[in-house]
């Protein structure tokens, strides 16, 4: 795929995630919203060099090495996706603090992209099945962290996409909103 096409896919993916959110959105879109980014990751993974030796040992250093350029591609495309997602869903923060909203957009996109790159690295080493399990683990871990630290940002937890249709998520009383995130991720991976 050409660079421009992949950039457009990443941007479309961010809009797809954003369109599934809030009052104006269509929540069922979330069940397919990660598929374009997963396909981009698969394309990059299949076309790049095998960097499986990088995960263990000195993973931090090798993440930034030239042999691991596929990680940078995954990071770049996922960052575009998640930045657009953050802007389309929490644009209203701009009215309170332009500088604060810019920081929130970028930090949230970085955290989401980091979870996605970790998934990419594990998938390269351990294969597809374990890699997709790692995606669920890293994403839920990132959301859990994001709910429990000083810079908590609960709005974009994937399970919150159903805030406008609480009738279909009554089971959240048992699993919490992270159960909804798990549901969203599993369906995106299976589809």
Regions found by a protein language model. Name each.
Residues 1-191:
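Membrane-embedded alpha-helical bundles of multi-pass enzymes
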């Amino acid at each position: 795929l050409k660079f421009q096409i992949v950039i457009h896919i990443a941007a479309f993916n961010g809009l797809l995630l954003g369109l599934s959110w809030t009052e104006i959105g269509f929540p069922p879109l979330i069940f397919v919203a990660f598929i374009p980014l997963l396909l981009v990751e698969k394309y990059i993974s299949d076309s790049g060099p095998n960097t499986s030796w990088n995960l263990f040992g000195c993973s931090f250093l090798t993440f930034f090495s030239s042999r691991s350029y596929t990680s940078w591609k995954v990071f770049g495309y996922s960052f575009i996706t998640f930045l657009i997602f953050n802007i389309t869903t929490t644009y209203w923060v701009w009215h309170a603090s332009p500088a604060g909203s810019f920081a929130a957009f970028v930090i949230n996109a970085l955290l989401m992209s980091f979870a996605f790159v970790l998934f990419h690295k594990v998938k390269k080493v351990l294969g597809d099945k374990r890699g997709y399990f790692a995606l669920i683990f890293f994403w839920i871990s990132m959301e859990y962290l994001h709910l429990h630290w000083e810079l908590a940002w609960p709005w974009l937890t994937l399970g919150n996409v159903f805030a406008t249709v609480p009738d279909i998520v009554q089971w959240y009383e048992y699993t919490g909103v992270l159960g909804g995130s798990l549901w969203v991720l599993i369906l995106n991976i299976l589809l």
